[in-house]
Amino acid sequence: MLNFEYCNPVNVVFGKGQIAKLAELVPQDAKVMMTYGGGSIKRNGVYEQVMDALQGRKVIEFGGIEPNPKYETCMKAVEICKAEGIDFLLAVGGGSTLDGTKFIAAAAKYPEGQDPWDICLKGAPVLDEIPIGCVI
């Protein structure tokens, strides 16, 4: 076995009824963009649980993140983040929603005049990002 150190400063909350913990974990004064995919969260009850937990916060919804998110879709969310002063992203859904939201977080803080696509295409460094939470 190799010697190594691993530091992963991520708070993971797991289990039944844990969505309510968002009330404690998302800053009270946050301007939140909630991202999701095709709308299953509205059919399975997760949407209501998330919105209940986020009461008192400004929440802007961005739905329609498709499987294997398209750059154009994510960039629409980036523009909203910039226009609305979003300072917290909450991805609600599966892997594609989380992947798209991670890109949105980095692209929204990418230097003006530069193309955020370089993060994916050229491996450009991410120097700043909007904080992210996720409900999977």
Stretch-by-stretch model annotation:
Residues 1-88:
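ATP/NTP phosphate-donor binding region
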Residues 72-136:
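Glycine/threonine-rich beta-strand-loop-alpha-helix active-site module
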